[in-house]
Structure formats: C-alpha cells, structure tokens
C-alpha cells in the first residue's frame, strides 16, 4: 500500500539494516515483506522508474513482454508458477495469457511503465493524506500494511480489513472480494 510505511521502517528495510525494536508481530511481518521486496523485487520498478523508454524488449517482442510480466519479481513469479501448475489462485493460465495479449495488441507495455517514472521512488513513504481512506490488506500484496501504519499514514481511516486471499492485482485476482471491499470502504460515507 502506497504511502503507509513509516520512515523508521522504510529506510532499514531498504538498506538491509535490522528493523527497529518493539515491532508488533504484524509490523515485523510487514517489515520482512518489504525487506524481501527491496532485495528481490525492486529492480523492475527501478528500471521503469528511471528509464521506461529503454524497455524496447517488451515492445518489440511478445516473448520479451511475456518474460517481463511473468518474471519481474519473485512473489509474482511464485504466484504465476502455482497457477501454471494448476493450483487455484483466483487467476487462470488463460487470464495471464489474456493479460499479456492485451498489453501486446494495444502496445501499452512501455506507456504503462511510465507510471513508475511519474511517481519515482519513495512510493511507500507517508504522504499525509487528509481525506477519508479505506484500506484493504491482501495477503499476497508486496507487504501487508498493519493497522498501526495505516492509522499513522491516514488520520481519517474509515475502513481497515485484512483479507484471506488476493495480492498485488487484487481487482483482477479476486474481483468479487475486491468489489465487496470497495463497497465496505465507501459505506461509512453514505448519509
């Protein structure tokens, strides 16, 4: 979740330093997930954040595009490997191949990578959002934001829920769950 990682967590996780003492079990778990991402999954984000227009291999070759999508970080690779092995993960092999085809036929792989360039790094750092915010924590996301971090980053937190399944592409992987969470998140705003 963007904007919720406290500085005293983000910096040590990024540099490989030990975590601060006194973390709750949820905070320690999130710290470990962030440290893993920084060590094993950040290179693709850095490339797209710094030089998205140099990713010609994903525009010029359907195999290059498939390779980039299927193996851009260790957690996504593990999820896709389980799906291609026939395990139920909310997505099917056809869903993944359809997604690759959509990027290929619309020629939007590099333009979609520009989102990283436009946002640069520091993506996880607090942004001090002052409007009502709803947070849904999916277990296979890059990190599972603890309630304490969400409350610190979003003073007007109106909904927080930890779910049993779903990941970085929750709306795609678990559309029913995602829809239910959107409804639950906006429900407190209805008058």
What residues fall within each predicted segment?
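C-terminal subdomain of alpha/beta-hydrolase-fold enzymes, centered on the catalytic histidine
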Residues: 46-191
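A catalytic-pocket lid/entrance helix-loop region that shapes and gates access to the active site
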Residues: 1-55
